[in-house]
A protein has these predicted regions:
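Residues embedded in well-ordered secondary-structure elements
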Residues: 6, 67, 92, 112-113
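A non-catalytic, helix-rich entry segment at domain boundaries
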Residues: 20-103
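Hydrophobic (often cysteine-bearing) scaffold residues that line and stabilize catalytic clefts
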Residues: 9, 13, 17, 74, ...
């Protein structure tokens, strides 16, 4: 059966980190890398965490779902992630031959029996050299994904559905769409590479 969704510091942090990274990528692809690098990412993360906390509290009737020390711990982990991201960004996201198709790209696909598939794709990038699309799902994780998480069909099937329905919605052949997770670890360890 389906469980009831409850907000937590993990969802608040994940949403906030998504918003900051997506803003960075939007500026990077639509303007310049230099402008993206000049963004005050640390302040943006703090602002998004506070905003998302306030919104969750409004929506849940004021029920406290995380403590101040959790917010501080996650924010400090976020600072390390942003530092890592700025250093390693070029390994994962390049402007040379790539264009940003969209951020939070909506999918609204009609299925049989009056069922709709509705979702949002975190990032879509077009490779103009190879004429290919890349659907990227940003995941925040406490310690990264082990082989079991990588093999979890619930996780991988989501991206396969995005690929299927995005391709169908935009008349793009499936063999021209790649899917990829961009996993950012909340807990970083010395001498451990991503």
């Amino acid at each position: 059966g389906l469980g009831e969704f409850t907000d937590s510091i993990h969802t608040l942090f994940g949403t906030s980190m998504h918003e900051v990274l997506q803003t960075y990528l939007t500026v990077m692809y639509n303007d310049t890398i230099k402008m993206a690098d000049a963004l005050p990412l640390e302040k943006m993360l703090l602002h998004r965490m506070k905003e998302n906390y306030t919104n969750i509290m409004k929506n849940n009737g004021g029920e406290v779902f995380c403590e101040q020390e959790d917010m501080e711990e996650f924010y400090n982990h976020g600072l390390l992630i942003l530092e890592w991201f700025k250093k390693k960004r070029g390994m994962y996201f390049s402007k040379k031959g790539y264009e940003l198709v969209g951020i939070e790209v909506p999918i609204n696909y009609d299925l049989p029996n009056k069922i709709k598939f509705i979702g949002y794709i975190d990032v879509i990038i077009y490779d103009s050299v190879r004429d290919r699309y890349k659907i990227i799902d940003i995941k925040t994780s406490t310690m990264g994904w082990n082989k079991y998480a990588k093999a979890d069909k619930n996780k991988t099937d989501q991206l396969l559905l995005y690929k299927q329905f995005y391709g169908a919605q935009h008349d793009i052949p499936m063999d021209k769409i790649d899917i990829e997770y961009f996993i950012v670890k909340r807990k970083l360890y010395e001498k451990v590479d991503f």
